[in-house]
Amino acid sequence: MPEDGGGDSGDVPEIIPDGEPLREEQRPLKQSLGSSLCRESHWKCLLLTLLIHACGAVVAWCRLATVPRLVLGPEAALARGGGGPPPTYPASPCSDGYLYIPLAFVSLLYLLYLAECWHCHVRSCQAPRTDASTVLALIRRLQQAPPCVWWKATSYHYVRRTRQITRYRNGDAYTTTQVYHERADSRTARGEFDYSAHGVRDVSKELVGLADHAATRLRFTKCFSFGSAEAEASYLTQRARFFSANEGLDDYLEAREGMHLKDVDFRESLMVFADPRSPPWYARAWVFWLVSAATLSWPLRVVAAYGTAHVHYQVEKLFGASSPPPGAVPSGPPLSRVATVDFTELEWHICSNRQLVPSYSEAVVMGAGSGAYLRGCQRCRRSVSSNSLPPARPSGPRLPFSRSRLSLGAGGRATPGVFRSLSGGPLGRRGEDTEPLESPPCYEDALYFPVLIVHGDSGCQGDGQGAL
């Protein structure tokens, strides 16, 4: 795993462990001033700063501004009696104690401002700080880590319980019974996606240019995709089988799913510096608190956001990387569809393709001459179930379509009635000569009780005319 070719990577192409060519490059992006403001507006800090400065302006106005006030007393009465203007004197507009109102607001807002600055500092310290070489080594481990797509199903129900609580009314304490419901987990199952038959490889990008910026905020996410339809169908089938196997075991089912990388410490956010021992001036703690004490924290945050580059690195795993060769024959049966994975009987009919039901139009146009239609296939037989014919007033509920198809597939005692036998045997020809042709059945009879063609296990061995 060579990592010492940082500056000469353009001369010798790098080969990743899979033996594939160089990955697509991804570089950190330094945002403009407007985009950095939209990304991290810090509107709480801005609002508190504006309110503090507004209250400070009111206090300064109360201390510096003067307004004329009338003189109260005998001098004012003598002046009004002589016909002259009333005597006034300059005074502060907040001289009667109104100065304490904006001072109280300033003190309260300043405390809120310091609390908001403390929360901002804590959030910034939550992201670990590291250098570019450590991040590149971490990315290499993330690329080489095998993925694990997991599912978790928790079956639970609620239990009704009671407890004694003490309440107070009019100074008197009394005990009452409270009824509440508590969740009780009965069973927890976990499963993983088995991708050994399809293979997996990492298709993440190659991160370059971290050392070109003084500070870079790195955000990690992980995802997976499919390189073939077989891998996607296998994932959906395993997922559906897992949750269907754990469904119905209790009153409720909590389903969770996700992905993690094995044998690696995945972090969602990192702060990368070119030299962690001497970070830029706007990223130092003492500068932050010194500027925050002067109520200039918001401009400092804008400068820090503008000087920090951002990059969103996505670790992507591709399932289905090792697809079988074009001439290879699949070893197992085709994958079942997820939409009908719970309908075992329907899936069996679709996969085996043993019963072919003619439509109503095909059943009407079938005549006696169509007996040669089935002579080419010696393994096909046509059967009519006289026991399944509908009575005049059906007394019970109608069977499901799949069950009715199975009942009609078994050969019963054929009686002349709605459907004519087309087996081509002597009994069938004698019946045609002696009995008149009857009218076709009604639509519901033909829909619910069709005439079926049942094939053998090996299928038709004729010239392909047995397909209906």
Swiss-Prot record:
Compartment list: Membrane
UniProt keywords, alphabetically: Membrane, Transmembrane, Transmembrane helix
One Pfam family cited in the UniProt record for this chain: TMEM151
Coiled coil (UniProt feature): none
Region (Disordered): 1-25, 384-438
Ranges that cross the membrane: 45-65, 98-118
Highest taxon of the lineage: Eukaryota
Protein name per its UniProtKB record: Transmembrane protein 151B
The organism of origin for this protein: Bos taurus
Originating gene: TMEM151B
